[in-house]
Amino acid sequence: MRQASVTLAMLAGFDSLLVQDALAQGKPPMPFRVQIVYSPLYVIDLGGLEKLHPFDIRKYEKIYKQLLLDGKISDQHALVPEPLTRDQFLLIHTEPYLQSLKVRENLIRYLEAPALRLAPVDLEKKIVEPVRLSSGGTLSAARAALEVGIGINLGGGYHHAKPESGEGFCIIADIPIAIRQLQADNRIKRALIVDVDVHQGNGTICCLRDDESTFTFSMHQDSIYPIPKEIGDLDIELQAGCMDDEYNRILEENLRRIMSSFQADIVFIVGGCDTLSGDPLAGLEMTTEGIVTRDALIVASCVEKNIPVVFTLAGGYSSEAWKTQYQSIRHLIDTYGVAK
Protein backbone atom coordinates (compact mmCIF):
# COMPACT_ATOMS: atom_id res chain seq x y z
CA MET A 1 0.00 0.00 0.00
CA ARG A 2 1.39 3.41 -0.95
CA GLN A 3 1.96 5.72 1.97
CA ALA A 4 0.11 9.03 1.73
CA SER A 5 2.49 12.00 1.50
CA VAL A 6 0.69 13.66 4.41
CA THR A 7 0.46 11.09 7.20
CA LEU A 8 -1.94 10.92 10.11
CA ALA A 9 0.98 11.24 12.52
CA MET A 10 2.01 14.52 10.88
CA LEU A 11 -1.53 15.87 11.20
CA ALA A 12 -1.50 15.32 14.96
CA GLY A 13 0.87 18.27 15.29
CA PHE A 14 -1.78 20.70 14.05
CA ASP A 15 -3.68 20.62 17.34
CA SER A 16 -0.82 22.24 19.23
CA LEU A 17 -1.07 25.29 16.98
CA LEU A 18 -4.76 25.88 17.65
CA VAL A 19 -4.65 28.09 20.75
CA GLN A 20 -1.77 30.22 19.45
CA ASP A 21 -3.45 30.78 16.08
CA ALA A 22 -6.87 31.49 17.60
CA LEU A 23 -5.49 34.08 20.00
CA ALA A 24 -3.62 35.73 17.13
CA GLN A 25 -6.96 36.14 15.33
CA GLY A 26 -8.62 37.59 18.42
CA LYS A 27 -11.09 34.70 18.64
CA PRO A 28 -11.45 32.26 21.53
CA PRO A 29 -10.42 28.73 20.54
CA MET A 30 -13.32 26.43 19.77
CA PRO A 31 -13.61 23.11 21.60
CA PHE A 32 -13.50 21.08 18.36
CA ARG A 33 -15.58 18.09 19.30
CA VAL A 34 -17.62 16.01 16.85
CA GLN A 35 -21.40 16.25 16.62
CA ILE A 36 -23.01 13.50 14.52
CA VAL A 37 -26.29 14.39 12.76
CA TYR A 38 -28.50 11.54 11.57
CA SER A 39 -32.04 10.20 11.33
CA PRO A 40 -33.15 6.69 10.33
CA LEU A 41 -35.62 8.51 8.06
CA TYR A 42 -32.70 9.39 5.74
CA VAL A 43 -33.06 5.91 4.25
CA ILE A 44 -34.99 5.63 0.99
CA ASP A 45 -37.01 2.42 0.85
CA LEU A 46 -38.68 1.54 -2.45
CA GLY A 47 -39.32 -2.10 -1.73
CA GLY A 48 -35.97 -3.18 -3.14
CA LEU A 49 -36.00 -1.08 -6.33
CA GLU A 50 -33.49 1.30 -4.73
CA LYS A 51 -30.91 -1.49 -5.13
CA LEU A 52 -31.02 -0.97 -8.90
CA HIS A 53 -29.54 2.52 -8.47
CA PRO A 54 -25.71 2.81 -8.30
CA PHE A 55 -25.87 4.87 -5.10
CA ASP A 56 -26.01 2.85 -1.88
CA ILE A 57 -28.65 4.84 -0.03
CA ARG A 58 -28.21 2.56 2.99
CA LYS A 59 -24.61 3.65 3.54
CA TYR A 60 -25.87 6.33 5.94
CA GLU A 61 -27.55 3.67 8.05
CA LYS A 62 -24.58 1.29 7.82
CA ILE A 63 -22.15 3.93 9.06
CA TYR A 64 -24.40 4.99 11.92
CA LYS A 65 -25.00 1.42 13.08
CA GLN A 66 -21.27 0.63 12.94
CA LEU A 67 -20.48 3.71 15.04
CA LEU A 68 -22.98 2.45 17.61
CA LEU A 69 -21.67 -1.11 17.46
CA ASP A 70 -18.09 0.00 18.02
CA GLY A 71 -19.07 2.28 20.89
CA LYS A 72 -17.96 5.49 19.17
CA ILE A 73 -21.31 7.18 19.78
CA SER A 74 -24.59 6.45 21.52
CA ASP A 75 -28.15 7.00 20.33
CA GLN A 76 -28.32 9.93 22.72
CA HIS A 77 -25.35 11.58 21.05
CA ALA A 78 -26.79 11.81 17.54
CA LEU A 79 -28.60 15.03 16.71
CA VAL A 80 -31.84 14.42 14.80
CA PRO A 81 -32.41 17.21 12.26
CA GLU A 82 -35.51 19.02 11.09
CA PRO A 83 -36.34 18.86 7.37
CA LEU A 84 -35.70 21.97 5.31
CA THR A 85 -38.68 24.29 5.15
CA ARG A 86 -40.18 25.68 1.96
CA ASP A 87 -38.67 29.10 2.69
CA GLN A 88 -35.23 27.57 3.19
CA PHE A 89 -35.54 25.62 -0.07
CA LEU A 90 -36.35 28.88 -1.86
CA LEU A 91 -33.19 30.55 -0.54
CA ILE A 92 -31.47 28.83 -3.48
CA HIS A 93 -34.01 27.05 -5.66
CA THR A 94 -36.79 28.53 -7.78
CA GLU A 95 -40.52 28.10 -7.24
CA PRO A 96 -40.98 26.34 -10.63
CA TYR A 97 -38.27 23.84 -9.67
CA LEU A 98 -39.95 23.20 -6.32
CA GLN A 99 -43.20 22.43 -8.14
CA SER A 100 -41.36 20.20 -10.62
CA LEU A 101 -40.39 17.85 -7.78
CA LYS A 102 -44.04 16.86 -7.53
CA VAL A 103 -43.92 15.39 -11.06
CA ARG A 104 -42.85 11.74 -11.19
CA GLU A 105 -41.05 11.92 -14.54
CA ASN A 106 -39.02 14.92 -13.41
CA LEU A 107 -37.76 13.06 -10.35
CA ILE A 108 -36.86 10.05 -12.48
CA ARG A 109 -34.83 12.32 -14.77
CA TYR A 110 -33.09 14.25 -11.98
CA LEU A 111 -32.15 11.03 -10.19
CA GLU A 112 -31.19 9.22 -13.41
CA ALA A 113 -33.26 6.27 -12.25
CA PRO A 114 -35.59 4.89 -14.96
CA ALA A 115 -36.34 1.89 -12.73
CA LEU A 116 -38.42 4.23 -10.57
CA ARG A 117 -41.15 3.99 -13.21
CA LEU A 118 -41.81 0.55 -11.76
CA ALA A 119 -42.19 1.80 -8.18
CA PRO A 120 -45.87 1.72 -7.10
CA VAL A 121 -45.28 4.40 -4.46
CA ASP A 122 -45.52 8.15 -3.97
CA LEU A 123 -42.02 9.27 -5.02
CA GLU A 124 -42.39 12.65 -3.37
CA LYS A 125 -43.00 10.96 -0.03
CA LYS A 126 -40.47 8.16 -0.50
CA ILE A 127 -37.63 10.20 -2.05
CA VAL A 128 -38.10 13.96 -1.75
CA GLU A 129 -38.99 13.88 1.94
CA PRO A 130 -35.92 11.82 3.00
CA VAL A 131 -33.67 14.10 0.93
CA ARG A 132 -35.32 17.18 2.44
CA LEU A 133 -34.57 15.74 5.88
CA SER A 134 -30.95 14.85 5.14
CA SER A 135 -30.50 18.31 3.58
CA GLY A 136 -31.82 19.76 6.82
CA GLY A 137 -29.15 17.62 8.45
CA THR A 138 -26.47 19.66 6.71
CA LEU A 139 -27.92 22.86 8.18
CA SER A 140 -28.14 21.20 11.62
CA ALA A 141 -24.52 20.03 11.31
CA ALA A 142 -23.46 23.56 10.39
CA ARG A 143 -25.24 25.05 13.38
CA ALA A 144 -23.64 22.41 15.59
CA ALA A 145 -20.21 23.15 14.13
CA LEU A 146 -20.56 26.80 15.11
CA GLU A 147 -20.96 25.63 18.71
CA VAL A 148 -18.67 22.60 19.06
CA GLY A 149 -16.32 22.89 16.06
CA ILE A 150 -17.09 19.82 13.92
CA GLY A 151 -20.50 18.81 12.55
CA ILE A 152 -20.81 15.56 10.59
CA ASN A 153 -24.00 14.89 8.67
CA LEU A 154 -24.33 11.20 7.81
CA GLY A 155 -25.92 12.28 4.54
CA GLY A 156 -25.98 15.40 2.38
CA GLY A 157 -23.38 16.71 -0.03
CA TYR A 158 -25.83 16.92 -2.95
CA HIS A 159 -23.46 18.99 -5.03
CA HIS A 160 -25.02 18.53 -8.49
CA ALA A 161 -28.36 20.18 -7.67
CA LYS A 162 -28.80 23.56 -9.38
CA PRO A 163 -31.18 26.44 -8.64
CA GLU A 164 -33.59 25.44 -11.40
CA SER A 165 -32.97 21.70 -11.78
CA GLY A 166 -31.64 18.50 -10.28
CA GLU A 167 -29.16 16.09 -11.82
CA GLY A 168 -26.53 13.53 -10.96
CA PHE A 169 -28.68 11.89 -8.26
CA CYS A 170 -29.04 15.28 -6.50
CA ILE A 171 -32.27 17.25 -6.07
CA ILE A 172 -31.58 19.71 -3.21
CA ALA A 173 -28.53 21.98 -2.93
CA ASP A 174 -28.08 21.40 0.79
CA ILE A 175 -24.77 23.19 1.29
CA PRO A 176 -25.67 26.45 -0.53
CA ILE A 177 -28.99 26.49 1.36
CA ALA A 178 -27.20 26.04 4.69
CA ILE A 179 -24.83 28.88 3.84
CA ARG A 180 -27.67 31.24 2.90
CA GLN A 181 -29.61 30.40 6.08
CA LEU A 182 -26.57 30.97 8.32
CA GLN A 183 -25.92 34.27 6.55
CA ALA A 184 -29.56 35.30 6.99
CA ASP A 185 -29.25 34.46 10.69
CA ASN A 186 -26.06 36.58 10.92
CA ARG A 187 -24.14 33.53 12.12
CA ILE A 188 -21.57 33.72 9.31
CA LYS A 189 -20.47 36.04 6.54
CA ARG A 190 -18.11 33.91 4.44
CA ALA A 191 -18.00 30.19 3.67
CA LEU A 192 -15.49 27.90 1.99
CA ILE A 193 -16.59 24.72 0.22
CA VAL A 194 -13.92 22.02 -0.14
CA ASP A 195 -15.28 19.45 -2.59
CA VAL A 196 -13.22 16.26 -2.73
CA ASP A 197 -15.86 14.09 -4.38
CA VAL A 198 -14.46 12.60 -7.60
CA HIS A 199 -17.08 14.49 -9.63
CA GLN A 200 -17.00 18.27 -9.85
CA GLY A 201 -19.64 19.99 -7.73
CA ASN A 202 -21.14 21.75 -10.72
CA GLY A 203 -24.42 22.44 -8.95
CA THR A 204 -22.76 24.14 -5.99
CA ILE A 205 -20.81 26.33 -8.38
CA CYS A 206 -24.00 27.34 -10.21
CA CYS A 207 -25.78 28.12 -6.95
CA LEU A 208 -22.96 30.36 -5.69
CA ARG A 209 -21.70 31.89 -8.94
CA ASP A 210 -20.30 35.43 -8.66
CA ASP A 211 -20.72 35.36 -4.88
CA GLU A 212 -17.76 36.97 -3.17
CA SER A 213 -18.90 35.69 0.22
CA THR A 214 -18.17 32.08 -0.79
CA PHE A 215 -15.25 30.18 -2.30
CA THR A 216 -15.65 26.87 -4.14
CA PHE A 217 -12.62 24.57 -4.27
CA SER A 218 -13.13 21.33 -6.17
CA MET A 219 -10.67 18.47 -6.81
CA HIS A 220 -12.14 16.05 -9.32
CA GLN A 221 -11.38 13.65 -12.16
CA ASP A 222 -11.06 15.38 -15.51
CA SER A 223 -12.76 13.13 -18.06
CA ILE A 224 -15.98 12.05 -16.33
CA TYR A 225 -19.36 13.57 -15.47
CA PRO A 226 -20.13 16.43 -15.47
CA ILE A 227 -19.09 17.33 -19.00
CA PRO A 228 -18.61 20.18 -19.65
CA LYS A 229 -17.40 21.34 -16.26
CA GLU A 230 -18.51 24.57 -14.62
CA ILE A 231 -15.93 27.19 -13.67
CA GLY A 232 -15.57 27.50 -9.92
CA ASP A 233 -13.23 29.63 -7.85
CA LEU A 234 -10.57 26.91 -7.94
CA ASP A 235 -10.88 23.66 -9.89
CA ILE A 236 -8.15 21.02 -9.83
CA GLU A 237 -8.58 18.34 -12.49
CA LEU A 238 -6.97 14.96 -11.84
CA GLN A 239 -6.25 12.20 -14.32
CA ALA A 240 -7.41 8.62 -13.91
CA GLY A 241 -4.97 6.61 -11.82
CA CYS A 242 -4.16 9.40 -9.34
CA MET A 243 -3.01 7.81 -6.06
CA ASP A 244 -2.73 8.85 -2.42
CA ASP A 245 0.66 10.58 -2.57
CA GLU A 246 -0.15 12.86 -5.47
CA TYR A 247 -3.72 13.56 -4.38
CA ASN A 248 -2.93 14.60 -0.82
CA ARG A 249 0.11 16.62 -1.87
CA ILE A 250 -2.01 18.67 -4.29
CA LEU A 251 -4.76 19.01 -1.70
CA GLU A 252 -2.43 20.20 1.04
CA GLU A 253 -0.68 22.76 -1.18
CA ASN A 254 -3.88 24.33 -2.45
CA LEU A 255 -5.79 24.16 0.82
CA ARG A 256 -3.09 26.06 2.69
CA ARG A 257 -3.01 28.74 0.00
CA ILE A 258 -6.81 29.13 -0.05
CA MET A 259 -7.19 29.27 3.72
CA SER A 260 -4.49 31.92 3.94
CA SER A 261 -6.14 34.16 1.34
CA PHE A 262 -9.87 33.54 1.93
CA GLN A 263 -10.96 34.22 5.49
CA ALA A 264 -13.87 31.84 5.99
CA ASP A 265 -16.21 31.73 8.98
CA ILE A 266 -17.11 28.10 8.24
CA VAL A 267 -15.88 25.31 5.96
CA PHE A 268 -18.09 22.71 4.28
CA ILE A 269 -16.52 19.45 3.11
CA VAL A 270 -18.12 17.46 0.30
CA GLY A 271 -16.43 14.24 1.40
CA GLY A 272 -17.24 11.88 -1.45
CA CYS A 273 -15.68 8.42 -1.28
CA ASP A 274 -15.81 7.80 -5.03
CA THR A 275 -12.09 8.58 -5.20
CA LEU A 276 -11.60 5.06 -3.80
CA SER A 277 -9.87 2.60 -6.12
CA GLY A 278 -12.41 0.40 -7.86
CA ASP A 279 -15.31 2.86 -7.83
CA PRO A 280 -17.48 1.92 -10.83
CA LEU A 281 -18.16 5.54 -11.83
CA ALA A 282 -14.60 6.88 -11.62
CA GLY A 283 -10.95 6.03 -12.11
CA LEU A 284 -8.84 7.36 -9.25
CA GLU A 285 -6.75 4.90 -7.23
CA MET A 286 -6.93 6.12 -3.65
CA THR A 287 -6.81 3.69 -0.73
CA THR A 288 -8.88 3.78 2.43
CA GLU A 289 -5.83 5.05 4.29
CA GLY A 290 -5.37 7.83 1.76
CA ILE A 291 -9.00 8.95 2.05
CA VAL A 292 -8.89 8.87 5.86
CA THR A 293 -5.77 11.03 5.65
CA ARG A 294 -7.43 13.34 3.10
CA ASP A 295 -10.39 14.03 5.37
CA ALA A 296 -8.19 14.37 8.46
CA LEU A 297 -6.01 16.87 6.60
CA ILE A 298 -8.95 19.12 5.74
CA VAL A 299 -10.39 19.01 9.25
CA ALA A 300 -6.98 19.60 10.84
CA SER A 301 -6.47 22.63 8.59
CA CYS A 302 -9.75 24.05 9.90
CA VAL A 303 -8.79 23.28 13.50
CA GLU A 304 -5.45 25.00 12.96
CA LYS A 305 -7.26 28.13 11.76
CA ASN A 306 -9.99 27.86 14.44
CA ILE A 307 -12.71 27.59 11.77
CA PRO A 308 -15.84 25.47 12.31
CA VAL A 309 -16.12 22.63 9.81
CA VAL A 310 -19.02 20.61 8.41
CA PHE A 311 -18.57 17.17 6.84
CA THR A 312 -21.08 15.69 4.37
CA LEU A 313 -20.88 12.22 2.81
CA ALA A 314 -21.70 12.92 -0.88
CA GLY A 315 -20.84 10.13 -3.37
CA GLY A 316 -19.21 6.72 -3.30
CA TYR A 317 -20.46 3.84 -5.43
CA SER A 318 -18.35 0.80 -4.64
CA SER A 319 -19.43 -1.85 -2.15
CA GLU A 320 -16.56 -0.74 0.12
CA ALA A 321 -17.39 2.98 0.09
CA TRP A 322 -19.36 3.00 3.33
CA LYS A 323 -16.57 1.14 5.13
CA THR A 324 -14.01 3.73 4.06
CA GLN A 325 -16.23 6.63 5.12
CA TYR A 326 -16.85 4.87 8.42
CA GLN A 327 -13.08 4.63 9.00
CA SER A 328 -12.71 8.33 8.24
CA ILE A 329 -15.48 9.39 10.62
CA ARG A 330 -14.21 7.00 13.29
CA HIS A 331 -10.75 8.55 12.99
CA LEU A 332 -12.18 12.05 13.46
CA ILE A 333 -14.08 10.91 16.56
CA ASP A 334 -10.96 9.20 17.94
CA THR A 335 -8.94 12.36 17.30
CA TYR A 336 -11.31 15.03 18.62
CA GLY A 337 -13.88 13.20 20.75
CA VAL A 338 -17.65 13.60 20.66
CA ALA A 339 -19.58 16.65 21.80
CA LYS A 340 -21.24 16.28 25.19
Q: Where would I find each of the regions flagged by the language model?
A:
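N-terminal export leaders
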Residues: 1-7
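HDAC/HDAC-like amidohydrolase catalytic core signature
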Residues: 6, 15-340
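N-terminal secretory signal peptides
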Residues: 10-12
